[in-house]
Amino acid sequence: YTSYLLAIVDQENFVGHVYYGQKLQYTENTPAPVYLLRTGEAPFVPSQNNRERVSFLDSFPMEYPGNGLGDYRESAISVRTAQGHVGVQLQYVSHEIVKEKPALPGLPSTFPGDEDCDTLILHLADPVIGLAADLIYTTFEEEDVITRSVILKNTAEQPIYLTKVMSACLDLDCTDEKYDILTLHGSWGRERQMERRSLMHGKQSVGSVRGESSHQEHPFIALLSENATQDTGEVYGMHFVYSGNFLAQAELSQFDSIRMTMGIHPENFVWKLEQGESFAAPEVVMTYSSEGLSGMTHHYHDMYREHLIRGEYRDKKRPILINNWEATYFDFNTDKLLKIAKQASKLGIEMLVMDDGWFGHRNDDSTSLGDWKV
């Protein structure tokens, strides 16, 4: 099992990320190990007060970093107000813990099933521009998984334009460890090829602007300790429960801290929020494994089998179908299809899918696509 620790710091009520990893042994009466929270001094970063020490925004491990106010790493959110204001910094207001998993309006997401889930909702706000945010964390203890999402609400009188909304951000201190990044690329017929490379200073990302998640890049990213194997070493995984445009990114800063972000791709993304309106970001499923890649994949397998897949065939063998494409390509008729169906039926196959070529003059790839009537 794992521990995930946050802290509210500074007079600006920043939400800082303290720790994510193997379970820490402490009780309610033991002070949280806030010494793990990395802070520093920043003579060139503005602060709203005149203390001698300020949180170094350009290295501080923000839980949901804003934009344009001193943190020059990848942001989780960017906005533009009706007056052209682009800076945003969300600050802690309050929080609540509920014994359920709230559904995301209009979006696919995991569900609790028979398992008891705890959900932490952090209520944040930028009082200057009038933007409220709920950071939503649900823990699935048996699968050792945390799901994350964000709901934004315009509390101002004027519209706010969202130009970037990441669903999750994870800041890690890696001064004592080097890490690799693992992504899944591919194309037609060779989907989800594993590619592992060293995480270097700067940003490394995968994404899609195709209107779909695509097999060119899968909406997944993992951070691995340099010596991690299939069965040993640390692995942090993020997976996006969304089939549209996405961006998954890892950034190694000048101070050797890592920031992982995942969400809707900001390219060509603008969402107008009128007064009182809300925007829900899709869900990220994240997990930590101290037992290498196998530990991570087992977490995801268990999670999706129990809490994402729906329907009667979740726990039993599914019906089998046959597709005529590889057998006939464009050249088929009724007799050919019936012959395939009869042979398939003898093997226990229950459905025949008639593929490309049944409409119009579709005898090759150069004509008639979409020229059909039912």
Task: Report the location of each language-model feature.
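Terminal connector regions
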Residues: 7, 140, 286-319
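Extended acidic/polar, glycine-enriched regions
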Residues: 149-160, 166, 240-304
